[in-house]
């Protein structure tokens, strides 16, 4: 398996720290609003990676955090008059419902920032004691100048940090690029339940220390893969990396850094509230677009490439999914899904996913399977191929198992083959009356037959 590693700017063979247990961390939602399709794309990307790793390794621990305290949450909660716990609970529930609709597996662990304050305080204390952080006016700042490797992940130099995203100029800072680890609580913070005691006074954590603490708590000082959107590379991931490398001498933090590309709408337009073009998963679902279609649109573009969301992409996804489902509809659910985990995944699909999660190539393999199913005349061979399609689509999360027909609609394949053989013999012997009777008998059983030009008779359920 190969993954593109942002840190080394190259596709690398995946070599986990411990092949018996692969560990992955992905940045999750900040729960102050409904999940939009940019959030959803990232979730689907790392869900596919989680599924693939589970296919290849005996154990996988996937941690995806929930940021349930930050400036946006506090401001939004203040507008409603709720404390941050009550306010975020609703959006966490909505997020989980959306993820279920997209068929994203639950992560192994889903920590909330507000439940991990003690670990954050522990890390901040280590950074202060080691000289990588300093206290000014009740705030604690990380000193980027203290970390000689700062900027290597995003390819930036310390002198350029002042122009970086989310970097504010503050007279308290020793360097404009220094970032806050702990900030003093305001009256509003206290009122909304967004303040905790610390050695530096009442306050709340900075954004970056939250992920450092949660990854450390559940995955240790070093782990295999850190994932997130390309927009998080700087400053968030750069700062996470600096914090953990400085808190734990000798730690590499994450062995591989994986970033999914940006998402635009309607021919390259950036989503923003000011433009009024933010598309939420819930909004799409309420308009009748099923989660499988949303997921399929994401998978049609390689995760590292920009993705443009538009009506044509939705239509194409709906059409493609319909073709897959139709290729399996003659079989019962039991035929398609019984002991499905024992069915091998399509080799071309698996190899595509192992090559830096090449989902477009994997989808092409699925449609090649659909073509084989549709041109195969033998029922048992079609069923065999359909089960491979079902298993392979399940690996990608496109389905949890194609539905097929109910058990009551099952047919006796051996009986059908016997009747088809009798009909062939009747036709060859010129007994067309008997051949027609057998055709009618098959029709009464719900079986439609078609005689091809080459003399092969195909059958399917009506």
From Swiss-Prot:
Record-level Gene Ontology MF annotations: ATP binding; cysteine-tRNA ligase activity; zinc ion binding
* Catalytic activity annotation: tRNA(Cys) + L-cysteine + ATP = L-cysteinyl-tRNA(Cys) + AMP + diphosphate
| InterPro entries associated with the record | Cys-tRNA-ligase, Cys-tRNA-synt_Ia_DALR, Cys-tRNA/MSH_ligase, CysS_C, Rossmann-like_a/b/a_fold, tRNA-synt_1_cat_dom, tRNAsynth_Ia_anticodon-bd
Q: Which GO terms describe its biological process?
A: cysteinyl-tRNA aminoacylation
Record's keyword annotation contains Protein biosynthesis: yes
Q: What is this protein called?
A: Cysteine--tRNA ligase
Motif range for 'KMSKS' region? Answer: 270-274
Q: Which family does it belong to?
A: Belongs to the class-I aminoacyl-tRNA synthetase family.
GO CC terms of this entry: cytosol
Q: According to the UniProt entry, what is the EC number of this protein? A: 6.1.1.16
* Residue positions binding ATP: 273
**Keyword Nucleotide-binding among record annotations:** yes
Locate the residues binding Zn(2+). Answer: 27, 211, 236, 240
Q: Which Pfam families does the entry mention?
A: CysS_C, DALR_2, tRNA-synt_1e
The superkingdom listed in its UniProt entry is Bacteria
Cofactor or coenzyme needed = Zn(2+)
From the UniProt record, list the coiled-coil ranges: none
Subunit structure of this entry? Monomer.
> Motif 'HIGH' region: residue span?
29-39
Q: Which residues form the signal peptide?
A: none
The family database entries (CDD domains) matched by this protein are listed as: CysRS_core
The annotation note on the cofactor reads: Binds 1 zinc ion per subunit.
Compartments reported by the entry: Cytoplasm
In terms of NCBIfam families, this protein maps to: cysS
